[in-house]
A protein has these predicted regions:
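N-terminal lobe/hinge region of extracytoplasmic solute-binding protein
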Residues: 31-81, 198
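Aromatic- and charge-enriched surface segment that lines or borders ligand/interaction sites
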Residues: 76-126, 293-295
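Surface-exposed binding/hinge segments that line
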Residues: 124-182
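Gly/Pro-rich hinge or "lid" segments in bacterial periplasmic/extracellular proteins
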Residues: 159-231, 244
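Ligand-site clamp/hinge motif
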Residues: 219-266
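Periplasmic-binding protein-like
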Residues: 290-335, 385, 472-481
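Extracytoplasmic/peripheral linker and loop segments enriched in polar/acidic and small residues
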Residues: 313, 402-411, 435-498, 517
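Structural transition elements
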Residues: 317-364, 381-382
Length: 517
């Protein structure tokens, strides 16, 4: 009997080792060209950094594709009846990639960093409803004053006002942990090298080479991870190479997946698989600066209505998409699909219905002695888009229209002071959150919109899906912002890869569910 038990035990060990070996051998090669400098949750920004970040870290909550939330590092969460206290209970078995336990202090430390102005976290405005957060962000109080409490197994967040969008913050970088001792020991290089990066997600960073001639990164199965996103993959190897020839390398079996330019989509081949996501929303913003011609509603309306949206597809590279909204399609807000029942109404100059407006504007421009107008743009790609509008304005108003290439900050400044009549501005889209896009339009978030009514609606403690949709509509009704087109990013996968998807929050590849034949 003892011999039989020994044989069974031996077979069990062999099968276990065989299974581990099979999993370890499944390493996907994902090629991209963007060099990762930091995978610090509060600093990471380019596509490669975010791909690594969301695979090696796990936030308190996980955003699902339908806009709902599930538990990540949190075992459970609850919101008080008055909607001012958010409580998280942490998973008892959660560990860092070095085997240390994850606790409430780790999430608290990251939140304090997120609102600390010295961190310059791009998503800090989404945390402004937490007690004292605004005062901390304006350097009036210390990060230690942030309205949170914690112990080893929990984190509690106290809000100054009801915030229907606060859960999104905890499904992203602000909801990820940062261990203070590791942060301090890194000496300013936290999450900038393999040795200064520890994480709590299904993968852990195992290689990061930044030397010339070999720029690579690799993350492998985190043996200490026991959460809801356990993976069958052994890891993901990320060689950094220019995009030239990437499709050939994929077809020849040298790589398994990678990013491709929109112009290459049609060449990807039937056997290969494509995933895409919206990465930017490009709008035409219009000046309403006081003491300028653009403060005149009729003049601004005429410029707005004569902006050429019809020729966008002719002006743009293939696979860009004409926008019907400032917010990207399939976005969610307040737990619901954005504009499912109330599509944004955009102006269309059909049958000459705005001829009176154009005539009045032409007279107004003449009376104000306006002899030229300027439209600004950020990139060479955008020039052809603004050229169509410039031609329209010249024909309608009989004045010279210049197109000016400028920096984003100078375009925003020029629209605010009236140096530019309008400017083409691109905003990055963070996954499927409509609210994050609306925040980026606000001047407080570094955006272009100074309209008080819009800002008040976006930051309101009583905001709802309907009130936010109305706020967006007001930008169109006041002729301040006109949706133009969406930028998209594309990922191509060989037929040997299955189960791949994109993280709804970041729009980057989720390798936790992927498998390799």
């Amino acid at each position: 009997m003892k011999k039989l038990l020994c044989v069974i035990a031996a077979l069990s060990i062999i099968l276990t080792l065989s299974s581990c070996k099979e999993s370890d051998s499944k390493v996907i090669t994902y090629e991209t060209e963007a060099l990762p400098d930091s995978v610090d949750p509060l600093i990471a920004s380019n596509d490669t950094e975010l791909t690594i970040l969301y695979n090696i870290f796990e936030p308190l909550l996980l955003l699902e594709s339908d806009g709902s939330f599930s538990c990540g590092a949190a075992e459970s969460y609850s919101l008080s009846d008055d909607k001012l206290t958010l409580s998280f209970t942490l998973r008892k078995d959660a560990k860092w990639s070095d085997g240390e336990a994850v606790n409430g202090a780790d999430f608290a430390f990251n939140l304090k960093r997120a609102v600390d102005p010295s961190t310059r976290f791009a998503g800090s405005t989404a945390l402004s409803s937490i007690k004292n957060a605004k005062a901390i962000m304006s350097s009036e109080q210390s990060p230690e004053a942030l309205g949170i409490s914690y112990d080893d197994g929990s984190l509690t967040v106290y809000l100054e006002r009801e915030d229907s969008e606060i859960l999104y913050a905890f499904a992203g970088p602000a909801g990820m942990p940062c261990r203070e001792d590791s942060f301090d020991a890194a000496g300013g290089k936290y999450c900038m090298t393999k040795d200064t990066t520890i994480s709590n997600g299904p993968f852990a960073l195992s290689r990061w080479v930044k030397s010339q001639g070999e720029e690579t990164a690799k993350f492998i199965n985190n043996k200490y991870y026991s959460g809801p996103r356990a993976t069958n993959l052994g890891g993901v190897y990320i060689p950094l190479k220019k995009a030239d020839g990437r499709l050939d390398r994929l077809k020849n079996g040298n790589i398994d997946c990678g990013t491709i330019d929109s112009s290459e989509v049609s060449s990807a081949g039937e056997k290969n698989q494509l995933l895409s996501d919206y990465c930017s929303s490009v709008v035409m913003a219009f000046s309403s600066a006081e003491n300028t011609a653009f403060a005149d509603d009729t003049i601004r309306k005429a410029l707005y209505f004569s902006t050429d949206r019809d020729n966008i597809q002719n002006a743009l590279p293939q696979f860009y998409e004409k926008a019907g909204d400032i917010v990207s399609p399939d976005s969610v807000c307040c737990g619901k699909l954005w504009r499912k029942d109330s599509p944004l109404t955009l102006p269309e100059n059909t049958d000459g219905q705005f001829s009176d407006v154009f005539s009045s504007a032409k007279t107004g421009l003449s009376e104000k002695k306006v002899t030229s107008l300027s439209i600004a743009y950020e990139t060479d790609e955008q020039k052809s888009v603004v050229n169509y509008t410039a031609q329209n304005w010249q024909k309608l108003f009989g004045i010279r229209v210049d197109t000016v290439k400028s920096t984003r900050s100078q375009i925003i400044k020029g629209i605010k002071d009236g140096s530019f009549a309008a400017g083409l501005i691109s905003f990055n889209i963070d996954g499927s959150s409509a609210y994050s896009t609306l925040l980026k339009l606000c001047a407080e978030g570094g955006g272009i919109v100074t309209d008080e009514g819009y800002t008040e609606a976006v930051y309101s403690s009583n905001k709802t899906l309907e009130s936010l949709e109305a706020a967006e509509s007001s930008l169109v009704e006041k002729c301040l912002v006109l949706p133009m087109y969406y930028g998209k990013k594309y990922y191509v996968f060989s037929s040997d890869v299955s189960g791949q998807s994109l993280f709804p929050y970041s729009g980057t590849v989720d390798f936790t569910k992927a498998d390799l034949l």
